[in-house]
Amino acid sequence: MKLIVRQYVQSLKERDELDVLLPQLLSEVGYEVIHHPGRGTKQAGVDVAAVGPDPDADGEKALHLFLIKSGDLGRTDWNGGKPQDVMPSLDEIRYDYIPNRIPEQYSKLPISICVCMGGEIKEVIRSYWRGYVQTNTTETIRYREWNGDRLANLILSGVLNKELLGVDRRVSFQKSVAMVSEPETSYRHFRDLIDGLVEDIEDDHRGTTRLRQLVISLWILVSAGIEAENLESPYRCCELALLYSWDVLNRSAGAKKKEEKARAEILDHVLSLYLSIGHKLIVEKIGPHSNKRYALSSAVRSSSELDINLALFEAMGRAALLGLWHHFIGLKAKGENRHRHLTTRDQCLDIAVSLVNENPTLTIPLRDDHHIEIGMLMLLAQGRGAVSGVTGYLEEIVSRLNYRYRLRKSWPTHFQDYRELARHPVDQSDEYFQKSTKGSVLVPFLKVALERIQANELLEVFEKTIAEELPEMTQQVWVPRDGTDEFIWRKGTSQGIAIPVPMMELKEGSRSLANQMDEIVENFKALFEMSAVRRGLVPLLLMACRHHRLPLPPHLWFQVEDGAQSEEKDGSEATN
């Protein structure tokens, strides 16, 4: 356990990793953090400031001023000519922070200036460090070395100690990290860990401690995945942790403001970790190969059409979801942050479109719930104002569906179990055909999509195919109801309402299915009352639907008329 944690600490970067972890650890073991890392402001050498016992002075209460560095400290880190090097930063603390920035209520406390690093001080500069400490130590100012070993001990004795984490959870945690190269096994053990942590979680500090255990365990798992060059389990676990963290925050109505604020910060950390690992997986790892013909289909390393199809839809869905997160965050941001998020959104859309163009399997959804990934791609295109660029994708899907339904060849089914999918189709008999197509959300989604992009001729052909070949199919949509908010994030159970569509026979001149869908949205408003939607976190609901394989509610189906944004350029086209 110590080795796992020590390697994790050693790998942490200074910004957005070590400087995020340290305040969490200090808060957990009883320190009062009075200064957090800032961006764009003068720090005067101090990354984190906290009041608490000095472990090197028999627990005497002191003001700790932390200077944070990643990895090992060598000669170039000590005084290599940059203002942010260790020695200039220590001088800045002495001459600026201490005389000018310490709050009055802490001014009489002894001061511990702590050089905090993920690794250790190398021998080549050890003498410089000792000389500096001896020269500048006074009765009220002393210097401390907080190396990776101390941080690992702090994690193990605090957040991940045996009493707090428990034997079963520690075993689940260790297995999830050890099996990171076996994604399904690693994910299963991490889910066991997270289930144990949030079960009957308290509203007080003990509950917040459990959340900190969750996020630190996740950080370590992600670090192990990066080290092993396998991001599958870390990505899935980040999604799961984000959903669970939101559920805990959403249930914290009885918590004090201090605890609620701490839990909101933890949620932000998990979201940042998801965005980071998503960028590594989608933009950095998949992106460079997305525009190469069959490259990612070949990367699946399977001759099975099913394996390739499932893997490519998974990749497209992840790209679309990551893009939607950056879209919603970007719209709320300003200046450079806004530009950065919207640029990443455009990258994600371009990657998803390239996947479609270069991997024809994406025009052949084998599962009915692949409407989730298709719907998210369309929603992302709408956000960018580029729906017209991906309409060809929808038309190609429907054209192929017409053929597959009539010839009863590799048609999409509502089955989700891999073994059933691997056997599908068992035969072409009427009995099996009806059994495997008895319900569908994909079909009404595609009908509405064709109507909204005004592909009227293709829509007419598709409706005729469905009427003649699938008269027994129940076409339906799923909408949340009161109480869905209690179950969807953690359990992912379908606590909603299934509505058969069309609600009445659509004859020539009657109301369109798209109009009926608009009426359903108008009449079933529970989605708009869901906690995440009310707080502007629509991508969180999309993530829950995709992660737990719940149908995409019609409230979140794309609208062509709402997609045009004059300030946005059209995206890349998805052609056949």
What are these regions (language model features)?
Residues 1-576:
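Mixed-charge (Asp/Glu-Lys/Arg
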